[in-house]
Curated annotation (Swiss-Prot):
Modified residues (Phosphoserine): 166, 181
Top-level taxon of the source organism: Eukaryota
Gene name, Swiss-Prot/TrEMBL: Tagln
Subcellular location: Cytoplasm
Organism annotation: Mus musculus (Mouse)
Taxonomic classification: Eukaryota, Metazoa, Chordata, Craniata, Vertebrata
Pfam families: Calponin, CH
Protein name: Transgelin
Induction details: By growth factors.
Domain Calponin-homology (CH): 24-137
Length: 201
């Protein structure tokens, strides 16, 4: 954001709303998970949005995180030995993380854009992506997730049912209650049309 001047008017209002979505408590939980998942050598960021952004900005920690969710020998992202210092290399590393996260199962609507992290435009979107990644890791339960499973919501899983042909045929003969009564046609309790209601006291 060093090359970008301050925003005014409507742009400032929009940026202010985006910044209010950032959750500091969630940041603590995500940092805790990343440290447990990747190991203590990743260090810890300074508290706050800026510290979190600087910590993840070069893409190396994110790449280590997504690699740690895969079994040994099938790591999707190549992590450089020395963290990249050139801007385009850092952005490329973040883009590789995003591709690997998408391949892991994170849906497009949960993904942040590279500039959201690199320029700190929408750190709440970065949090959303990491939450989605953590939720998927807990849901898959393949032994690669490390940390407290209660840190993330477990996603609902598909429960596929197979019916036999005879069960499907039986279902055709059942009158569903969506179609009205299943007790047969009857005019019990009906009054004749045009006849006034009889009120007896």
């Amino acid at each position: 954001m060093a090359n970008k001047g301050p925003s005014y008017g409507m742009s400032r209002e929009v940026q202010s709303k985006i910044e209010k979505k950032y959750d500091e408590e969630l940041e603590e939980r995500l940092v805790e998970w990343i440290v447990v998942q990747c190991g203590p050598d990743v260090g810890r960021p300074d508290r706050g949005r800026l510290g979190f952004q600087v910590w993840l900005k070069n893409g190396v920690i994110l790449s280590k995180l997504v690699n740690s969710l895969y079994p040994e020998g099938s790591k999707p992202v190549k992590v450089p030995e020395n963290p990249p210092s050139m801007v385009f290399k850092q952005m490329e590393q973040v883009a590789q993380f995003l591709k690997a996260a998408e391949d892991y199962g994170v849906i497009k609507t949960d993904m942040f854009q590279t500039v959201d992290l690199y320029e700190g435009k929408d750190m709440a979107a970065v949090q959303r992506t990491l939450m989605a990644l953590g939720s998927l890791a807990v849901t898959k339960n393949d032994g690669n997730y490390r940390g407290d499973p209660n840190w993330f919501m477990k996603k609902a899983q598909e429960h596929k049912r197979d019916f036999t042909d005879s069960q499907l045929q039986e279902g055709k003969h059942v009158i569903g209650l969506q179609m009205g009564s299943n007790r047969g046609a009857s005019q019990a309790g009906m009054t004749g049309y045009g006849r006034p209601r009889q009120i007896i006291s």
